[in-house]
């Protein structure tokens, strides 16, 4: 979903990062080596199955689990994380979340935190910067503005209204000024 969304926005230059814990700094992370190994390997496996090129960065994981970050480099700054998917084996247990499996046994789920567009503010700032404010028409809140040149002409105003109705029938967001 992240990459199809990027395609919709024309984002082609990005870098995938597998953010891992630092095993030498265990105080910074949830203390469960088995969980960490399982989660990190699961993300590696998914990335490899998808054929994604990625780098691994030690010490960049969240305290509760590893994550896949998708980073971009804006025109005027350093690389930023736009999207993220985070595996969380820790918090479901802390919140005592359970589900019943097919055998009727209670199990603790794994939570996937994901932000397809990341912080909306950051995403919009990136898109505005990259497009220099020339957003794609499909993204504009008002796609067409109809402005009759003679506002005191009833026939012209009726025609302008007709144009607006035709456009709205085609799911075009239109405004009559």
Where are these regions (language model features)?
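NTP/phosphate- and nucleic-acid-binding module
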Residues: 1-177
């Amino acid at each position: 979903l992240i990459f199809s969304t990027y395609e919709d926005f024309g984002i082609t230059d990005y870098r995938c990062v597998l953010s891992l814990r630092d095993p030498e700094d265990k105080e910074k992370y949830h203390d469960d080596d088995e969980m960490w190994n399982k989660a990190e390997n699961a993300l590696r496996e998914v990335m490899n199955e998808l054929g994604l090129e990625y780098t691994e960065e030690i010490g960049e994981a969240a305290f509760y689990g590893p994550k896949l970050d998708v980073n971009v480099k804006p025109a005027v700054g350093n690389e930023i994380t736009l999207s993220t998917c985070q595996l969380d084996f820790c918090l479901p247990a802390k919140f005592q979340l359970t589900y019943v499996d097919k055998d009727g046994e209670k199990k603790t789920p794994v939570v996937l935190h994901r932000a397809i567009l990341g912080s909306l503010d950051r995403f919009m700032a990136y898109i505005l910067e990259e497009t220099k404010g020339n957003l794609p028409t499909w993204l504009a809140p008002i796609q067409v503005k109809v402005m009759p040149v003679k506002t005191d002409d009833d026939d012209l105003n009726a025609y302008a209204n007709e144009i607006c109705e035709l456009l709205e029938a085609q799911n075009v967001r239109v405004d009559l000024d």
